[in-house]
Amino acid sequence: MGGMKADSPGTIFSVPYEIAVVRPLRQTTLGDRDDALRAAHYNTELIPQDLIYIDLCTDSGVSSLSTSQLSALAGPKFAEPGMGLAPEGSRAYALLSEQIRQSFGFPYVVATTQGRSAERIWTKINIKPDTVVAGNMLFPSTRNHIELNGAKIIDVITESAHDLASSDPFKGNVDLEKLAAAIEQHGAEKISCIYVELCVNACGGQPVSLANLKAVRTLATAHKIPFFLDASRILENSFLVKERERGYHDRRLREIVSETCAAADACTMSALKDLLVSSGGLLLTRDRGSYQKASMQAFIDGVQLPGVAMELLVTSLDDIFASESTMANRVGQVNYLWHRLSDGVPLVKPAGGHAVFLDVRAFLPHLSPEQFPAEALAAFIYHMSGVRLTKGPPAAPSQARRGLELLRLAIPARKYLRGHMDDVTEAVLYAYAHRHEIKGLKRVEDSARSKYDPAHFRQP
């Protein structure tokens, strides 16, 4: 987030966009929010959208659209027969493929309706039963798809990822000694792949350095192990590499993205995060045979991305790479909120790429895990302010074993202004000042049929 400098007013550029369309918000009372919490069984995920002031539940698929994206939606430039099915011979697909080659360096792309579809197809093709996948605290959907194919996941993330107070700038890095030990223990032939998530959500949106990616590439090549990336947050990761890694401060974002991809054999990604669209997933590969299998599987599963959505994705990539200020503003807003809260409130350090994470155990030390402290804190903050937080994806197994519990403040791109972040700051600071008044919750038995169903809670 830029600021005015008296000696160089030409640097003033805090917000790289102006507001073209607005959605009025309803101002709720304390009583309204009390009723909403009761109706939602104290689960903030279940609160209706019109009763929320600032929604930090997720940044996925809820970013504001640019005027160029709206133009693409209003009248596709490349409309043609069959565009709704997005055949790979269409102009929309050709345009997307060319953008992917230029920006990411992969010759083959399969565009799907969402990231988990791309993951499901890719793991089905590449992950074999009774094998091992080495990863760095992978996202729950990635873990699920790997395990559904009968493989075991070994976490080889750096130890600093488990130290919430550590200021290590690259807590998403792979521990190369752990990785080498896993290869030696299981044998390279038993390892289906090395799978690395960029800007690891589970440990606070923490990036992976390019030096680390290149070292992983060297190990993978030496042992003939495929190396894949979850590149859903590749732009955030690349921006943080530009800010934190020596030798990249003057590099263009597109160059860092390309160099990141050059380390991998393939990537899967959700387009709903960094690519600032509301639908779409990508599977990028260098291997024609794998591409053909994946393309056929996408057709069979009925998850091919429609042509209009492809065009919207191309337009978004054009916008992002034309002006790095979009990503600077996105990461800068997270950094601003983190710094506003960092003086006293227990947070994951350092600031991540897409969200601020509260250390729930340190925030509410008087509540045991059985009292659902993260859910209780989210309910309290909503009750007092109308700001919605949710616990987010389940903790990684290595975090659960250590008793770590985080509450995520995910900031959608181009949606909120500094005033909103100041209001969030006030809400969290109020909760922290009154933390000893926050009481735990009890789970209503059988309220959730599976771990993906929203649970119901009640106050004791």
What function would you assign to each model-found segment?
Residues 33, 37, 69-74, 179, ...:
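Generic structural signal of hydrophobic/aromatic residues within well-ordered alpha-helices
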Residues 5-19, 26, 301-302, 335-449, ...:
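Conserved C-terminal alpha-helix-loop-beta "cap" of PLP-dependent enzymes
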Residues 74-86:
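Positively charged, low-complexity intrinsically disordered leader regions
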Residues 82, 106-107, 322-323, 409-413:
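Glycine- and acidic
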Residues 2-50, 55-69, 88-109, 113-344, ...:
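Conserved PLP-enzyme active-site core in the AAT-like
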